């Protein structure tokens, strides 16, 4: 991975949510510089409201920066990306569609799949069923969301995000509402999918254990206006089993990250930097 090309590049990126805030130099995120290798798994942690979700919107092209440049897969971001998939804390499955039909939804609405969906329905459905089997939902493909547990719904949500075989998966607190045991099961499922397919992953989470277990690199964001203040490479060898979370090395990294975030909570926010003209 060290010799892989850069897949995500942020160069001095600033975002104000409207022109009035821009005139006041009031930014949601500021001075973001980031380079992520192709196939890398990164996690972003930080206090609530620090700009983590804003960063995700910039990465997917849902928001354009006020200043700076963003490249994804060596191409400028000029609008919503088709090469990315997203999953959130709420699975948001459509209640009138079966599990497999929920997973297929992106293929029905996103080109180039949309125009060929009817002709290739059987092929796409086979892909969806295989993906559901990989995440442990074999036998539940034709169930409705109300027949699935929260963990099962989140597995289906991840499958939906991956059905169009994106180059990048963005996860915004995907396991935050789940119990500890289910959460750890899904860590392992995500780990296995990433290991097999080697897409890029950007994970936003408040769970430091989750970030250290899954990521190659963890970034800590400051309080708003958000900027990256710590980059911590996770030097725990892969493949990682859950037993690694009980080791001294793992615990030390978690405590180190917690210390960075705790220090930010104790300090008074300094005045935001002024963006370059």
Predicted regions and their residues:
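A short, proline-enriched helix->beta-strand linker immediately N-terminal to the Walker B motif
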Residues: 163-167
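Conserved ABC ATPase "signature" region
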Residues: 104, 108-111, 116-140, 192
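Conserved ABC ATPase signature
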Residues: 144-148, 152
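Helix-to-loop junction immediately C-terminal to a conserved catalytic motif
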Residues: 60
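Catalytic Walker B motif of ABC-type/P-loop ATPase nucleotide-binding domains
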Residues: 169-172
């Amino acid at each position: 991975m060290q010799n892989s090309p850069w897949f995500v590049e942020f160069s001095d990126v600033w975002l104000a949510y409207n022109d009035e805030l821009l005139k006041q130099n009031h930014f949601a995120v500021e001075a973001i510089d980031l380079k992520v290798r192709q196939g890398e798994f990164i996690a972003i942690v930080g206090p609530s409201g620090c700009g983590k979700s804003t960063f995700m919107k910039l990465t997917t092209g849902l928001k354009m920066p006020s200043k700076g440049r963003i490249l994804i897969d060596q191409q400028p971001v000029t609008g919503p990306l088709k090469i990315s998939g997203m999953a959130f804390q709420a699975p948001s499955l459509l209640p009138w569609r079966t599990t497999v039909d929920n997973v297929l939804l992106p293929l029905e609405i996103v080109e180039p799949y949309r125009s060929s969906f009817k002709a290739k329905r059987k092929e796409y459905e086979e892909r969806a069923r295989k993906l559901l089997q990989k995440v442990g939902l074999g036998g539940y493909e034709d169930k409705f969301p109300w027949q699935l547990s929260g963990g099962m719904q989140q597995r289906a949500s991840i499958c939906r995000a991956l059905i169009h075989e994106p180059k990048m998966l963005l996860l915004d607190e995907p396991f935050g509402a789940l119990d500890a045991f289910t959460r750890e099961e899904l860590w392992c499922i995500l780990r296995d999918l990433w290991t097999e397919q080697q897409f890029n992953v950007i994970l936003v989470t408040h769970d430091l254990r989750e970030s250290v277990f899954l990521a190659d690199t963890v970034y800590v964001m400051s309080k708003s206006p958000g900027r990256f203040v710590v980059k911590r490479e996770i030097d725990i060898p892969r493949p990682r089993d859950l037993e690694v979370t009980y080791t001294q090395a793992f615990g030390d990294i978690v405590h180190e990250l917690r210390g960075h975030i705790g220090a930010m909570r104790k300090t008074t926010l300094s005045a935001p930097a002024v963006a370059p003209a």
